[in-house]
């Protein structure tokens, strides 16, 4: 029960419950835009099949949760917690992931660059640490660069589709998907290539200031 409530609060803060039905977000680029680093086939399957499945299953789980609440069915409410966490986390994680990638690449600057240099010594050090920790994930999961309320940056990994903020309290800035569907068709079992690709900056176009503002907007939306 507590897990279901905790996930609901996190989802609200992320702005995902500002609409009744979750939908698959459009990509800000074509499926082939990231080639040759990430193939169009992988992007199409990853987005339109895998992410769509998380969205569909999350909607089903939330419908069942609403019905269970109306009936006061505590047993069913508790039993839905794993599905909400897994599919809700998959939706949150992938929605962030697509925005982290850019055909044009880009390097951190301004407030984000200053924070990286402060907490890791350099962008290269941060990349190496993020790569090493993410490669070490056993099975499926994610590697993240996130920040805490005080503004310090941290690297963390999460298993399966566990969402970063609900699991660690860190606000996600940049995520790396190391589920096999994210790379296996193209790179087989060579995970490291996907973590430090030659054609796309590890940081993409993210900025600390922009991510903080998005978090504030999501909180305002959930309270409306």
Swiss-Prot record:
Q: Which UniProt keywords apply?
A: Manganese, Metal-binding, Mitochondrion, Oxidoreductase, Transit peptide
Q: What is its EC number?
A: 1.15.1.1
State one Pfam family annotation: Sod_Fe_C
Q: Report the cofactor remark.
A: Binds 1 Mn(2+) ion per subunit.
What do we know about how this protein assembles, alone or with others?
A: Homotetramer.
Question: Which molecular-function annotations from GO does this UniProt entry contain?
Answer: manganese ion binding; superoxide dismutase activity
> What InterPro entries has UniProt attached to this entry?
Fe/Mn_Superoxide_Dismutase, Mn/Fe_SOD, Mn/Fe_SOD_BS, Mn/Fe_SOD_C, Mn/Fe_SOD_N, Mn/Fe_SOD_N_sf, SOD_C_sf
Organism of provenance: Charybdis feriata
* Cofactor(s) required, per the database record: Mn(2+)
Please write the reaction equations for the catalytic activity of this protein. 2 superoxide + 2 H(+) = H2O2 + O2
Q: Which family does it belong to?
A: Belongs to the iron/manganese superoxide dismutase family.
Positions binding Mn(2+) in this chain are 46, 94, 177, 181
Q: Transit peptide from where to where?
A: 1-20
Q: What is this protein called?
A: Superoxide dismutase [Mn], mitochondrial
Per the record, its GO cellular-component terms are:
mitochondrial matrix
Main subcellular localisation:
mitochondrion
Please describe what this protein does. Destroys superoxide anion radicals which are normally produced within the cells and which are toxic to biological systems.
Top-level taxon of origin = Eukaryota
Compartments (UniProt record): Mitochondrion matrix
């Amino acid at each position: 029960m507590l897990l279901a409530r905790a996930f609901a609060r996190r989802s609200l803060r992320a702005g995902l419950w500002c609409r009744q039905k979750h939908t698959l977000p459009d990509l800000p680029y074509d499926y082939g835009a990231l080639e040759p680093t990430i193939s169009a086939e992988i992007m199409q399957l990853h987005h339109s099949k895998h992410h769509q499945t998380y969205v569909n299953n999350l909607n089903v789980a939330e419908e069942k949760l609403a019905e269970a609440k109306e009936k006061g069915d505590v047993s069913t409410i508790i039993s839905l917690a794993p599905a909400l966490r897994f599919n809700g986390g998959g939706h949150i994680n992938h929605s962030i992931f697509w925005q982290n990638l850019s055909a044009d690449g880009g390097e951190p600057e301004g407030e984000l660059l200053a924070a990286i240099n402060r907490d890791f010594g350099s962008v290269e050090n941060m990349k190496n640490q993020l790569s090493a920790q993410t490669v070490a994930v056993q099975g499926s999961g994610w590697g993240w660069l996130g920040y805490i309320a005080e503004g310090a940056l941290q690297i963390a990994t999460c298993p399966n589709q566990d969402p970063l903020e609900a699991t660690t309290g860190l606000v996600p800035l940049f995520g790396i998907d190391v589920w096999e569907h994210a790379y296996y068709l193209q790179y087989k079992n060579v995970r490291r290539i996907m973590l430090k690709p030659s054609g796309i900056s590890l940081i993409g176009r993210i900025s600390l200031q922009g991510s903080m503002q998005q978090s504030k907007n999501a909180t305002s939306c959930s309270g409306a």
